[in-house]
């Protein structure tokens, strides 16, 4: 009887440990995706000169490494902002 209770206790501990590790993996993945997202936004602004602004986020963008540039709203860690985004 004691050995059965001990075995059940060990199984319960293993199950609890496995589920908590999986939860930690999910949180780590969310953090990594978030940092990749902000890194990509920061990369959009490199090499660009801009006069973007106003309530409709209008203006001009000139980028040294791309001919396809435009003003658009971006999400930054501090909130929303109008900026220059280049592709290509």
From Swiss-Prot:
Tissue specificity field: Expressed by the venom duct.
Taxonomic superkingdom: Eukaryota
Keywords annotated in UniProt: Amidation, Bromination, Disulfide bond, Hydroxylation, Ion channel impairing toxin, Neurotoxin, Secreted, Signal, Toxin
Propeptide cleavage-removed residue intervals: 21-46
Signal sequence interval, chain numbering: 1-20
Keyword match Kinase: no
Residues recorded as bearing 6'-bromotryptophan in the entry: 80
4-hydroxyproline: modified positions: 55
Cell location: Secreted
Post-translational modification: Contains 5 disulfide bonds.
Sites of Serine amide modification: 87
Molecular function, one GO term: toxin activity
GO terms for cellular component: extracellular region
Main location class: secreted
Role according to the record: Sigma-conotoxins bind and inhibit serotonin-gated ion channels. This peptide selectively and reversibly inhibits 5-hydroxytryptamine 3 receptor (HTR3A) through competitive antagonism (IC(50)=53-86.8 nM).
Free-text note on domains in this protein's UniProt record: The cysteine framework is VIII (C-C-C-C-C-C-C-C-C-C).
Protein family membership: Belongs to the conotoxin S superfamily.
Protein name in the entry: Sigma-conotoxin GVIIIA
């Amino acid at each position: 009887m004691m050995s059965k209770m001990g075995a059940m206790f060990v199984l319960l501990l293993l199950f609890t440990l496995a589920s908590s590790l999986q939860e930690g993996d999910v949180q780590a993945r969310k953090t990594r995706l978030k940092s990749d997202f902000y890194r990509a936004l920061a990369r959009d602004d490199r090499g660009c000169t801009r006069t973007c602004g106003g309530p409709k986020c209008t203006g001009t963008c000139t980028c040294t490494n791309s001919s396809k540039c435009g003003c658009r709203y971006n999400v930054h860690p501090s909130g929303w902002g109008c900026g220059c985004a280049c592709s290509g």
